[in-house]
């Protein structure tokens, strides 16, 4: 779920919508939270309960109460999509009592939970519901932590700069220990980690999941459906220089500005700069500034994918890029169809495949997932990760990721 800053939260309060039996299994049942289904112990939850939901991709901290649960320890405290008792289970649902919290009714009659020690209250219907930082939850994939975290500490940056070297077992062993990280920092941490500041006009990419937006099934909005690619979010942006100042060009991952080779924090293994050079992004964006003189800045966002980026390599031995956003200061985000026409026809920048130009959501999530799984990827004719849906005006969007894909490639 995304918070008000459009940053993904991995742990948060929720209200259990329903609990249904699993045929043939008497000791467990299926809890329903929004569009998510989670296998839980029988009688553990009932509809209307306030509970804590941990989304898939969560890495739980190595402490109680998580370490008291054998099934979590066997999974190395990682929360992923899995098949359990012939059912799809996505996420983890835990009782507030597991953390020593209590359920209360405040003076205004609102339901909340409270920590008896700090007296702090959390409500399931506002920003206080988010518990990711409080509970110490991070991303299960270390690359995601580097890519999605607001900032990386000096040890992470040290490892990122020397990615190939630090992938070897001795270095990974040392990086798991505080004294080991300090030792390595003496030899590899001298380089300053002062990266360029994030361009404040660029919105970071993260689509909300349909499972957190169940009300959309009651709308008859028309959507443009595009293939979701399993890679790494990549942003290219240029800001027009004022007066005698030069234009400012940026290459970014999801949360980090990737400096050029002449900067002290340049990373040798950099797929983002590789794509910038492959498609001449600075030159393209400069041409677009000239074409649209009313634009103060222009941003192209997309996905870099291929060998070594994710487990799904799209049958490639190298990398490629496909755009999914074209945003200008004076127009906002372009419609997906118009973006494709502009970028591919005039600048030879490939865009994500368009699957449907006028799609209306079916009545249920199960039907939508059937649509997602109905065809293979347009890139290599293998399993498709999911679909991103954008409104015809380009303003609203969400994604539906195939649980079957997650089980195969991220389980």
Give the residues covered by each predicted segment.
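Core nucleotide-handling region used for phosphoryl-transfer chemistry
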Residues: 1-411
């Amino acid at each position: 779920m995304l918070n008000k800053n459009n940053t993904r939260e991995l742990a948060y309060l929720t209200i259990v919508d329903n609990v249904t039996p699993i045929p043939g299994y008497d000791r467990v049942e299926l809890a329903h939270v929004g569009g998510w289904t989670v296998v839980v112990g029988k009688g553990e939850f009932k509809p209307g309960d306030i509970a804590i939901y941990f989304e898939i991709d969560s890495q739980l901290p190595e402490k109680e109460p998580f370490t008291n649960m054998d099934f979590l320890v066997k999974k190395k405290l990682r929360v992923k999509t899995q098949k359990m008792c012939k059912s799809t289970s996505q996420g983890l649902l835990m009782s507030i009592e597991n953390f020593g919290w209590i359920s209360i009714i405040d003076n205004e009659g609102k339901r909340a939970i409270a920590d008896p020690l700090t007296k702090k209250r959390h409500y399931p219907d506002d920003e206080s519901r988010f518990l990711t930082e409080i509970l110490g939850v991070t991303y299960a994939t270390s690359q995601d932590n580097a890519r999605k975290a607001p900032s990386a500490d000096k040890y992470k940056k040290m490892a990122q700069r020397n990615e190939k070297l630090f992938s070897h077992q001795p270095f990974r062993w040392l990086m798991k220990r505080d004294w080991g990280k300090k030792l390595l920092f003496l030899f590899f941490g001298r380089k300053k980690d002062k990266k360029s500041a994030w361009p404040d006009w660029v919105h970071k990419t993260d689509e909300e999941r349909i499972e957190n937006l169940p009300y959309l099934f009651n709308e008859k909005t028309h959507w443009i459906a595009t293939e979701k690619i399993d890679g790494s979010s990549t942003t290219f942006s240029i800001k027009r220089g004022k007066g005698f100042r030069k234009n400012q060009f940026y290459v970014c991952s999801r949360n980090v500005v990737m400096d050029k080779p002449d900067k002290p924090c340049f990373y040798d293994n950099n797929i983002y700069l590789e794509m910038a050079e492959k498609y001449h992004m600075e030159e393209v964006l400069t041409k677009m500034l000239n074409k649209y003189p009313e634009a103060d800045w222009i941003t192209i966002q997309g996905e870099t994918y291929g060998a070594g980026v994710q487990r799904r390599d799209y049958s490639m031995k190298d990398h490629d890029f496909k755009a999914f956003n074209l945003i200008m200061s004076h127009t906002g985000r372009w419609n997906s169809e118009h973006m494709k026409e502009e970028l591919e026809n005039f600048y030879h920048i490939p865009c994500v495949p368009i699957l449907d130009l006028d799609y209306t959501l079916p009545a249920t999530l199960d039907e939508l997932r059937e649509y997602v799984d109905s065809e293979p990827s347009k890139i290599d004719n293998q399993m498709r990760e999911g679909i991103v849906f954008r409104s015809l005006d380009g303003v609203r969007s969400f994604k539906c990721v195939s649980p079957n894909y997650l089980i195969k490639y991220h389980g």
